[in-house]
Amino acid sequence: MLKDIQSPAKYLQGPDAAVLFGQYAKNLAESFFVIADDFVMKLAGEKVVNGLQSHDIRCHAERFNGECSHAEINRLMAILQKQGCRGVVGIGGGKTLDTAKAIGYYQKLPVVVIPTIASTDAPTSALSVIYTEAGEFEEYLIYPKNPDMVVMDTAIIAKAPVRLLVSGMGDALSTWFEAKACYDARATSMAGGQSTEAALSLARLCYDTLLAEGEKARLAAQAGVVTEALERIIEANTYLSGIGFESSGLAAAHAIHNGFTILEECHHLYHGEKVAFGTLAQLVLQNSPMDEIETVLGFCQRVGLPVTLAQMGVKEGIDEKIAAVAKATCAEGETIHNMPFAVTPESVHAAILTADLLGQQWLAR
């Protein structure tokens, strides 16, 4: 099997990047179809439109209705065709960006994504999650290439709720450990090949950046200001983690996250919050050294990520519920089977309960 690495064609980051990106966007198309929900359009829409128009790029802005569904994609594509735009810009959170990617794919147009939060590593990826109109998961759309441009305006992201940035750190926390597991197992990555040394190195840099800058970045976000630490964490959450996961692979941490989604008491948690606990469970599952586990526990406590089942909202009927989570985690096709050893529901059940006790012990110190 070939080794494979993929990434966006261009990644831009910095204060006011949502305005300054126009100088690069003009190389992609002479007109853009801009989508965002009402809140984001008021927050950043004017910035983006001005950034395009200042470089003589025509644009048409349209409201996104909030659901990345085939019906919404088709509705927006019809408007795009009527307007004759030759590129797509999505501004906002995951569903808006996924919709922009889908429109670009179906219309064979360049795509620019402008996240307003740094809560996951999804913006750089070559996939969209499609839902029904009722908001239920329908399918993944896998694209032949990543977005043409990812634009991270750190001045906008600094004003977002701190918990979203911390959730992004939780998602990014898993990247190194899952990438290394996939590398050791010679597993097939999301990119369709085996991991390169470059992708593995980016995953490691992601982890090292979290440990060095995470707490400082959280405080900057709390103050709503841009610092060098915040810049580095935004890059880690988005680019380093994005390339690391897509070109190396996912393993136990994300599968355990998926298992926890069956519990109603975990529905209030953000993606990265569940992934962070899944990372602790993966470390137990693979019998990582205690000093490594304690490093991760300390990081999670400092930035505000859950390290116990109680913090996840699971407080009653624990044994039975975790047995169900473990069974879901090990479903056929789940990424936990990328681990470099055989995994069973029983071993996952044991790892989760042990991770919980390790978290309790750490908090009681």
Describe every region a protein language model picked out.
Residues S288-R365:
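C-terminal charged capping/lid subdomain of soluble metabolic enzymes
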Residues M41-G45, K95-A102, T120-T124, G249, ...:
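Short glycine/serine/threonine-rich phosphate/pyrophosphate-binding segments
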Residues M1-G87, L309:
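ATP/NTP phosphate-donor binding region
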Residues M190-L305:
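Active-site segments that bind and position negatively charged phosphate/pyrophosphate groups
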Residues L80-I117:
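A short, small-residue-rich loop immediately preceding and capping a beta-strand
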Residues P15-D16, A36-D38, I91-G93, I114-I117, ...:
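Fold-independent oxyanion-binding glycine-rich loops
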Residues Y105-A198:
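A glycine/threonine-rich phosphate-anchoring loop and its flanking beta-alpha core
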